[in-house]
Amino acid sequence: MYLGIDIGTSGVKSVLIDAGQSLIASATSPLDIIRTQSGYSEQHPEWWWDAVQKTIAALQKNHQHELSAVQAIGLSGQMHGLVALDQDDAPLRPAILWNDTRCAAEAQVLDTQYPAFRTIGGNAVMPGFTAPKALWMRSHEPELFNQIKTILLPKDYIRFRMTGEKISDLSDASGTLWLDIENRDWSDELLAACGLTTAQMPALVEGSDASAVLSKDIAQQWGMANDVVIAGGAGDNAASAIGLGVIAPGHGLISLGTSGVVFSVTDQFAPAADSGAHAFCHALPATWHQMGVILSASDSISWLMESTGLSVDELTQKMDATNSLETSPIFHPYLSGERTPHNNADACGAFFDIKRHHHQGDLMRAVLQGVSFGIADAYDVLVAAGGKPSYILATGGGSQNITWINYIASIIDAPISIPKHQDIGAAMGAARLAMMASGLPIEQVCTAPEIAETITPDPDITAALTPARQKSQNLYNAIAALAY
């Protein structure tokens, strides 16, 4: 048996699988977000641990026998979150999350004054990354910054609670911007730019390697053996790729979760920071990936639900009553700023071209189309950087919305395949990493999923949405020149 634990933004998910990768059971526990000011997004690290404990307790109710047979555990999690620990290894403050944009000024300083972030770190400095968050803390909370003993990422804080060891994997560590991506190790130069040293960083392992062993106390609580191995694990996007068998050059995925991700595997470090692409280590040895990210994918739908008081099913029903090829209002999905390709923390969400006859269904269609335009913008960046995938899988909750996938496939002019089993995700990828950490070979573990359906580009949709996308881009450029 193998356990995968994913520390998401909206909740923690734990999955239990057998040696044949059949899902035995899963459990989830929701998480809240603290938003005290515009642009702020925080969570207490203790919330993650409490949620993990709740998912394990839920699994214990009906599957204690299977839990007792777990050989290894894999971890995945939301990337970039800053968890600052004091001399007693207690959090100094709530974790500053990936979608927190307060450090836009600090990101600009690092990006303009330290070109090594783009060359060694492989990425333009954006507010979502960990490095500018630490610099913000140094400037605005110096009394806390000076007490930092260790900085961990969200899933690595959970590893610390499980094992007592401070360790990260290379895929997640890539998102700090303190990693020498090509050489797969911490960079003294990049850390020094933020007033930090390698002594304040966790040890590093490959995602598929063993990192530590479950502590005796936690093993006893969870009814497990004392020799359960903890895999290095992965950031959420790399873990999702592992779960989908996206492990070799030419493999790609589009993830429609809270954020939207376009992911393409490479066999070498291929930075393209100037064009807005991210270059990270993958969760497997000698493997890298390029990635484009938009900050509000399904989160845009969540916002519309909150704003209208309607459920996603109700909004979809109203949308289905509209003409699917009629030009919808245009929506900019920049509710938390934007990463790829704009790198603009000040970008804002907006509707354009709203007419008297438009209603909630039209707004829902506009949101789906606007997020699709954002995904296409990120995809185009990867293509221009040489990372065009030869086949694409869809993952995340939004992948179940065929209309949405149809829009994306038609706009990027590429087929998109949807896995048959929608429970595949970061937690399953974490469980696969656990299997490899216990000694199983990559080719045996990282198989491709069974495909339920492949959505091919629809020429009518392409014809209808191409001019709308161009208009959306023109609107952004015009507004950015005036307001951003």
Stretches with model-predicted labels:
Residues 194-206:
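A conserved helix-loop-beta module that forms one wall/lid of the active-site cleft
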Residues 64-67, 76, 145, 198, ...:
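Alpha-helix termination/capping residues and helix-transition junctions
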Residues 3-4, 109-129, 135-167, 177-188, ...:
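Active-site core segments that coordinate phosphate-bearing ligands/cofactors
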Residues 25-29, 202, 352, 453:
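Structural signal for short hydrophobic segments within the conserved structured cores
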Residues 29-30, 98, 173, 295:
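A generic structural motif
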